[in-house]
C-alpha cells in the first residue's frame, strides 16, 4: 500500500484553500399569497422599488405597482396560469427595459420587444429603459420643419411639424387609423423612422395594417409594436412606452422619427382595469386620479432636439376614440390639453362620403404655418377661412329661400374646395402636387366644372403637370417657394388641361 508523504498532503491542502472562493449571494425573496385576474399579492418583499421587475418561480415576470405595509401588488406580464399560491417570487433589482437596435426596422414585436412575426430573433447590443425622462426645455428647439402627411386637408390647413404632438380624435369607424397609416406611407424616401403601436386591437386589423405596409414598401423604415385585444392588461399598458423607447433610440441618434399610438383610449382602459384590481381608489369615469400623468409622461417624450443633441426629432400622433362625438369626456379632454393640436374626424362627414372625414372647422394645429413650406403658405393661406365661411353659409342656406349671386358663388366655390380635399386611402400626394391642387381650387379654375368632374379633372391635371412641366416640381422642391415661374407653368398646364377636358366632355 502506497503511503502519502506529509509534504504532498500539505501541498494538496494549500491548493484547495487557495482555490476556495466564498461567495455570498443575497436575494430578495417573497411568497405569493393571492393570484388571479392578472394581479398577484406578495408578502416578504421588504426591499423593493415601485416599478421594479419581479420573477416568479415558473418564469412569469411582473411589475411591482402597489407597495403596501403588509403586501406588494404585482401586475403580471403574462397569463400567470401556472403561478401557485405559496410559491416563491424573486425581486430582480431592475426597472423594465428593452433591447434596441437598427435590426428592429421591418419587424413586428410585442410590448417586451420580442418578435411575433415568425422571422427569428432580433440581435441587439444596447438597451433602453421603457420609461425615460422627457427632454428638458434647454434640450429642445421650436418646431420648424414640416412633416408631410400626404393628405391635402392636413398639410394645407392643419400642418404638422417634426417634433409636434397632434391628436387624431373621432368616433369608431371614421378613418383614424387610415389617416395615421397614410402618414407613414408618405414618409417613404423622407428619411423618417416610423413606429406604429397597436394597443388592444383585433389581430386581423393589425395584420391588415402590416400587409398594407409590406405592399407599399413602408415596412423597411417601420417598426410595429402590437398587443392585441386578448393580451394581458399589463402588456397593453406597456406597449406605448416600448414604442416610445424605440423611437427615442433613433431620435438621440440624430434621426427623425414618427410614432403612432393606436389608440390611447384602450391603454387608459387597461390601466383602469389594473388599478381597480389593485384596489386603488377610482375617480372620474372610474379612472385612477393619475391617468393624466399616464399620458402626459408618454407624450412629453416627443420633441425636436436642439443642435447640440443632433437636431433629431420624435413626432407623436396619438389616436383617441370618442363616444358619439363627445370630446368633453375624461380621456379626450386630457389628451387634447397635452397635445399641440387635434385633427377631429366626423362620423357625419364620413357617412356623407367625405373622406378623409376631417372637420376643418374644429381641427387645429398649435404650431401653425411654422410647419409649412413657403409655397404652401402662399397658396393655402385663406383656404381654411373660406371653408369655415362656406360651412356657415351652407347652414344658413338651408333656411333661406333666395340667395344673392355672391352667396351662390361662394357656396359653389366651397363645394368644389370640399371635393378637392377628398382623397382615397393609401394614396398620399407629394407636397408639389398638393400646391398645384389647392391653387387650382382657390383661384377659381374649378368653378366652371360640375362637382362630379372635379376629381377626374384634378387627377388628369396632376398627371399632365408631371409629364409636360417637370420644372414645376423641381422649382417647388428645391426653393420651397411658389415663384412667378412656377405660377406661370401651373397656369399654362391648367389652361391646357381645361381645353383638353372640355373637348373630352364634348366627345
Swiss-Prot record:
Catalytic activity: ATP + H2O + 4 H(+)(in) = ADP + phosphate + 5 H(+)(out)
Enzyme class: translocase
One term under GO cellular component: proton-transporting ATP synthase complex
PROSITE patterns: ATPASE_ALPHA_BETA
Pfam families given in the database record: ATP-synt_ab (PF00006), ATP-synt_ab_C (PF00306), ATP-synt_ab_N (PF02874)
Compartments where located: Plastid, Chloroplast thylakoid membrane
Positions of post-translational Phosphoserine modification: 383
KW Lyase (keyword) present: no
Annotated S-S bridges: none
Protein name according to UniProt: ATP synthase subunit alpha, chloroplastic
Source organism (scientific name): Zea mays (Maize)
Gene symbol of the encoding locus: atpA
Amino acid at each position: 500500500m502506497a503511503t502519502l508523504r506529509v509534504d504532498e498532503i500539505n501541498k494538496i491542502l494549500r491548493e484547495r484553500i487557495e482555490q476556495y472562493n466564498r461567495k455570498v449571494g443575497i436575494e430578495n425573496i417573497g411568497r405569493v399569497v393571492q393570484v388571479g385576474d392578472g394581479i398577484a399579492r406578495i408578502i416578504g418583499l421588504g426591499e423593493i422599488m415601485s416599478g421594479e421587475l419581479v420573477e416568479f418561480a415558473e418564469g412569469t415576470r411582473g411589475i411591482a405597482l402597489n407597495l403596501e405595509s403588509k403586501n406588494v401588488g404585482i401586475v403580471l406580464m403574462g397569463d400567470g396560469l401556472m403561478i401557485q399560491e405559496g410559491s416563491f417570487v424573486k425581486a430582480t433589482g431592475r426597472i423594465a427595459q428593452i433591447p434596441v437596435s437598427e435590426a428592429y426596422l421591418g419587424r413586428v414585436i410585442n410590448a417586451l420587444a420580442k418578435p411575433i412575426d415568425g422571422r427569428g430573433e432580433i440581435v441587439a447590443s444596447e438597451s433602453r429603459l421603457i420609461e425615460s425622462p422627457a427632454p428638458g426645455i434647454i434640450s429642445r428647439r421650436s418646431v420648424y420643419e414640416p412633416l408631410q402627411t400626404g393628405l391635402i386637408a392636413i398639410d394645407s390647413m392643419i400642418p404638422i411639424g417634426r417634433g409636434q404632438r397632434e391628436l387624431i380624435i373621432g368616433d369608431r369607424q371614421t378613418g383614424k387609423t387610415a389617416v395615421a397609416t397614410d402618414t407613414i406611407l408618405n414618409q417613404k424616401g423622407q428619411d423618417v423612422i416610423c413606429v406604429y403601436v397597436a394597443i388592444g386591437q383585433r389581430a386581423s386589423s393589425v395584420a391588415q395594417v402590416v400587409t398594407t405596409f409590406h405592399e407599399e414598401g413602408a415596412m423597411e423604415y417601420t417598426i410595429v409594436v402590437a398587443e392585441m385585444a386578448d393580451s394581458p392588461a399589463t402588456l397593453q399598458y406597456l406597449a406605448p412606452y416600448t414604442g416610445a423607447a424605440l423611437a427615442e433610440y433613433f431620435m438621440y441618434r440624430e434621426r427623425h422619427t414618427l410614432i403612432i399610438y393606436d389608440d390611447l383610449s384602450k391603454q387608459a382602459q387597461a390601466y383602469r382595469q389594473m388599478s381597480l384590481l389593485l384596489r386603488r381608489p377610482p375617480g372620474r369615469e372610474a379612472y385612477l386620479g393619475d391617468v393624466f400623468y399616464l399620458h402626459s409622461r408618454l407624450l412629453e417624450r416627443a420633441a425636436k432636439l436642439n443642435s447640440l443633441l443632433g437636431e433629431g426629432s420624435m413626432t407623436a400622433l396619438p389616436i383617441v376614440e370618442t363616444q358619439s362625438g363627445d370630446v368633453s369626456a375624461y380621456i379626450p379632454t386630457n389628451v387634447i390639453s397635452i397635445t399641440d393640436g387635434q385633427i377631429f374626424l366626423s362620423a357625419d362627414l364620413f357617412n356623407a362620403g367625405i373622406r378623409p372625414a376631417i372637420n376643418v372647422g374644429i381641427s387645429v394645429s398649435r404650431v401653425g404655418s411654422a410647419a409649412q413650406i413657403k409655397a404652401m403658405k402662399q397658396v393655402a393661406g385663406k383656404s381654411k377661412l373660406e371653408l369655415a365661411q362656406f360651412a356657415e353659409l351652407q347652414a344658413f342656406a338651408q333656411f333661406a329661400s333666395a340667395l344673392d349671386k355672391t352667396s351662390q358663388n361662394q357656396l359653389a366655390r366651397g363645394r368644389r374646395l370640399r371635393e378637392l380635399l377628398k382623397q382615397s386611402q393609401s394614396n398620399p400626394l407629394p407636397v408639389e402636387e398638393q400646391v398645384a391642387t389647392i391653387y387650382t381650387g382657390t383661384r377659381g379654375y374649378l368653378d366652371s366644372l360640375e362637382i362630379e368632374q372635379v376629381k377626374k379633372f384634378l387627377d388628369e391635371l396632376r398627371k399632365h403637370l408631371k409629364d409636360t412641366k417637370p420644372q414645376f416640381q423641381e422649382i417647388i422642391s428645391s426653393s420651397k417657394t411658389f415663384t412667378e415661374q412656377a405660377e406661370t407653368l401651373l397656369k399654362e398646364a391648367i389652361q391646357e388641361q381645361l381645353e383638353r377636358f372640355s373637348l373630352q366632355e364634348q366627345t
